[in-house]
């Protein structure tokens, strides 16, 4: 079972709403075939949260969203 806490992610992105959006966009990228930046044994949503907690992905995800 994947153990990732929101508190670990909130250290990187303090706003819960921005954290949710960033994780969502990153998970979508992973589903589209982008390479994970951490161990990829879990589902895309868990991988996205792990990347955020590790500091590999951050708020910049919101700037990459097409308008």
Swiss-Prot record:
Keywords: DNA-directed RNA polymerase, Nucleotidyltransferase, Transcription, Transferase. One of its GO terms (molecular function) is DNA binding. It is an enzyme of class 2 (transferase). One of its GO terms (biological process) is DNA-templated transcription. SMART domains: RNA_pol_Rpb6. Its EC number is 2.7.7.6. The keyword Protein biosynthesis does not apply. Pfam families: RNA_pol_Rpb6. GO terms for cellular component: DNA-directed RNA polymerase complex. It catalyses: RNA(n) + a ribonucleoside 5'-triphosphate = RNA(n+1) + diphosphate. HAMAP family: RNApol_bact_RpoZ. NCBIfam families: rpoZ. PANTHER family: DNA-DIRECTED RNA POLYMERASE SUBUNIT OMEGA. The RNAP catalytic core consists of 2 alpha, 1 beta, 1 beta' and 1 omega subunit. When a sigma factor is associated with the core the holoenzyme is formed, which can initiate transcription. Promotes RNA polymerase assembly. Latches the N- and C-terminal regions of the beta' subunit thereby facilitating its interaction with the beta and alpha subunits. This is DNA-directed RNA polymerase subunit omega. It comes from Janthinobacterium sp. (strain Marseille) (Minibacterium massiliensis). The gene is rpoZ.
């Amino acid at each position: 079972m994947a153990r990732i806490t929101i508190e670990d992610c909130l250290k990187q992105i303090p706003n819960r709403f921005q954290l949710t959006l960033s994780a969502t966009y990153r998970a979508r990228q992973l589903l589209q075939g982008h390479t994970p930046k951490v161990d990829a044994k879990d589902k895309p949503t868990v991988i996205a949260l792990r990347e955020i907690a590790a500091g590999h992905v951050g708020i910049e995800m919101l700037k990459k969203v097409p308008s």
